[in-house]
């Protein structure tokens, strides 16, 4: 369950950012965290949310809502030059939709980024 390590990383990154803020003592809670997740990370978002609940216990991130934008990988065919989004078939075979070649360069789809977070303060 690699979702727990991702959840722990989210909490650690947010808490480190808050600690380094000039007015860190005014932050009362984190209400929402927006993520960018590449589809090739194979993260199960429901499991990530559950792991986040566990990892955020006792921190300002407790009860924060996680939202995610899922990013598709792209391919470039070394044979015909096709460029576009990666689509896999039921056999999990990845090939060029134009010429059927397996000689592809895959880019993107492995991202895992905190896009932003909404912090609540006294003010």
Swiss-Prot record:
Signal peptide: none annotated. GO terms for biological process: protein maturation; protein modification process. InterPro entries: HypA/HybF (IPR000688). Ni(2+) binds at residue 2. GO terms for molecular function: nickel cation binding; zinc ion binding. The keyword Metal-binding applies. The keyword Zinc applies. Keywords: Metal-binding, Nickel, Zinc. Gene3D superfamilies: 3.30.2320.80. It comes from the Archaea. Zn(2+) binds at residues 77, 80, 96, 99. Belongs to the HypA/HybF family. Involved in the maturation of [NiFe] hydrogenases. Required for nickel insertion into the metal center of the hydrogenase. This is Hydrogenase maturation factor HypA.
């Amino acid at each position: 369950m690699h979702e727990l390590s991702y959840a722990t990383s989210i909490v650690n990154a947010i808490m480190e950012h808050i600690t380094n803020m000039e007015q860190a003592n005014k932050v009362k809670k984190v209400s929402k965290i927006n993520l960018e997740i590449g589809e090739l990370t194979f993260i199960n978002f429901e499991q990530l949310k559950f792991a986040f609940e566990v990892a955020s216990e006792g921190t300002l991130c407790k009860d924060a809502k996680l939202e995610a934008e899922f990013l598709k990988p792209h391919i470039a065919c070394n044979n015909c030059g096709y460029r576009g989004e990666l689509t896999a078939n039921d056999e999990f075979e990845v090939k060029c939709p134009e010429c059927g070649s397996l000689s592809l360069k895959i880019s993107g789809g492995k991202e895992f980024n905190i896009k932003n977070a909404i912090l609540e303060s006294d003010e």
